[in-house]
From Swiss-Prot:
Keywords from the named record: DNA-binding, Methyltransferase, Restriction system, S-adenosyl-L-methionine, Transferase
Lineage: Bacteria, Bacillati, Bacillota, Bacilli, Bacillales
Protein name: Type II methyltransferase M.BsoBI
Pfam families membership: N6_N4_Mtase (PF01555)
GO-annotated molecular function: DNA binding; N-methyltransferase activity; site-specific DNA-methyltransferase (cytosine-N4-specific) activity
InterPro entries: DNA_methylase_N4/N6 (IPR002941), MeTrfase_CN4_CS (IPR017985), SAM-dependent_MTases_sf (IPR029063)
EC number: 2.1.1.113
Signal peptide: none
EC class (word): transferase
Length: 509
């Protein structure tokens, strides 16, 4: 959204006198390093919501990340680092008092932790996600009570006895995944993919094997996920060719320390993973009884899906949106997406369709306006747009970042549009959540605060303000004892500021 001009009077005199730009606790007392930009509105919401903050050990860093799922049956079938843990979802379900027959929503489904945890407890769920990696992560897990163990044993035996042969099919790489596998590994991967597609096993078993093939891609490749990028083994053609060009140009070769050692074969990884998953399925089928809960996966973005859902549908929402941290899931999971048939054009479309969290995202306002018009919801769109343009806190943040950009402190102008787009789109999502939640429904959002160019963005409190403006009642903001750090570049220039990792809890009256 266009921002309004802000007063350069940074804060009232009594506030100025008491500012501390470094504080050991979770309260933020200085949002703009060296008071460079206005921070009155951010200080106001800090004061308004600080009394509902509860520092907690019940929800720790392990629970609000994938770490606690690493040893959890089902949830560890595919590594999805951006997710949260099943234990977190169980704790929130208990706190919200949900029971069998209730319906829970996760508008950013990821690897499906919310829906799968609900399934085990007999609670209905709807999950929304646009990324194909999310779809393949969730669907095979949702079949947990449907698998035929004898059939899985037969599939295991057949794979064990197979010797892969040369296949003419080629892996449809993206430019950033080219050369990810040794030649023989790539051939074997395609061989087993073709075998799975053409086998006579049930849909459930075939989909499970597809999940396993996706889950082992990193393990059998020259790549390793590192933040939002792929790191490359020194033996990969990408590193070899890059260094060759650098030497021809008289430059030093890239110094890479990644050495993954001997890579397992596709067959080894497939068999080992299938064996582990078979044991998980056997144990869960023995310990747990199937229930009649219903679970729906909507393969779309939350921005598109939510406006079409009926009023008063959900008893709770538990989710974690992509963070406003420039991480691009289409790059992090490029290898998996390429394997699933996503080409360069589709990658760009997926990147733009996701919640704006990368510097490449463009404004979705015209697209959203046209979409709401197509659904005959023009008045709803206009109401949401008014909430965005009237958001004084977001206007202040936009102004502060623009001033930092003009001062040469923002290293990518796309950060400005990303931050504005992020909260603009969350306003649409929060509005639709309020409409689709039943009275009394509680909403939990897991998110991190961020800082760009010395400007702190209180994601937790700003999200809570937006939610309250829409009609939600703020209940509590859990903050973790473990704070989030800053990039080395920011610490070097602006000092270290501990940022909150929070779980915001709201209720529809």
């Amino acid at each position: 959204m266009e921002t309004v001009q802000m007063s350069l009077d940074l804060q009232p005199e009594d506030t100025k006198a008491n500012i501390e730009c470094s504080s050991p606790d979770y309260e933020i007392k200085c949002f703009s390093h060296n008071q460079f930009a206005p921070q009155i509105e951010r200080l106001k919401i800090e004061k308004k919501y600080i009394h509902i903050v509860e520092e907690t050990e019940t929800f720790n860093r392990k629970l609000v990340s994938y770490q606690a799922n690493k040893n959890q049956s089902i949830h560890n079938w595919i590594r999805y680092k951006e997710g949260f843990s099943s234990e977190l979802v169980q704790n929130l379900i208990e706190e919200f008092g949900l029971s069998k027959g209730d319906t829970i929503l996760d508008p950013f489904l990821g690897s499906g932790t919310t829906s799968l945890t609900a399934k085990m407890l007999g609670i209905n769920s709807i999950g929304i996600d646009i990324l194909p990696i999310s779809h393949i992560a969730f669907e095979p897990k949702s079949f947990i009570f449907e698998y035929n163990l004898e059939e899985l044993d037969r599939a295991y035996k057949e794979i064990y006895e197979i010797s892969p042969t040369k296949i003419e099919q080629k892996f449809n790489h993206l430019s950033i995944t080219e050369g990810a596998f040794p030649e023989e590994t790539e051939n074997d991967l395609l061989f087993f993919t073709h075998w799975d597609n053409n086998s006579q096993y049930s849909y459930q078993t075939k989909t499970l094997i597809k999940l396993i093939l996706v889950s082992i891609l990193e393990e059998i490749s020259y790549t390793r996920k590192d933040g939002q990028y792929l790191r490359w083994d020194y033996r990969s053609q990408k590193v070899i060719e890059t260094n060759k060009k650098r030497l021809e140009q008289g430059k030093e070769p890239i110094k890479t320390i990644l050495d993954k050692g001997e890579l397992p074969t596709v067959k080894e990884s497939l068999l080992n993973t299938l064996l582990t998953i078979k044991e998980d399925i056997k144990e869960i089928q023995q310990k747990c009884l199937p229930n009649e809960s219903v679970h729906e996966l909507i393969k779309d973005s939350a921005l598109n899906a939510l406006p079409k859902i009926n009023d008063n549908t959900f008893d709770a929402v538990i989710t974690s949106p992509p963070y406003c941290n420039r991480y691009d899931y289409t790059r992090t999971y490029a290898l998996e997406l390429a394997y699933l048939g996503v080409d360069e054009k589709k990658i760009r479309e997926l990147r733009q369709a996701q919640l704006s969290c990368t510097v490449e995202n463009k404004s979705k306002l015209k697209q959203l306006k046209d979409y709401y018009h197509s659904l005959f919801l023009e008045s709803r769109y206009a109401e949401i747009e008014r909430l965005v343009t009237g958001n004084e806190v977001l206007n202040e943040i936009n102004y502060a970042l623009r001033k930092r950009w003009e001062n040469g402190e923002v290293n990518n102008k796309g950060i400005l549009s990303m931050v504005d787009g992020y909260f603009t789109e969350l306003t649409f999502i929060f509005y639709e959540l309020f409409r689709t939640c039943k009275p009394g429904a509680k909403v939990a959002f897991v998110n991190d605060n961020v800082r760009y160019a010395g400007e702190i963005i209180p994601v937790d409190f700003l999200s809570t303000k937006i939610a309250e403006d829409i009609g939600f009642k703020p209940i509590k903001i859990y903050t973790l004892k473990q704070r989030k750090g800053n990039s080395s570049q920011q610490m070097g220039k602006y000092g270290r500021v501990a940022l909150r990792k929070s779980i915001t809890i709201w209720e529809k009256p």
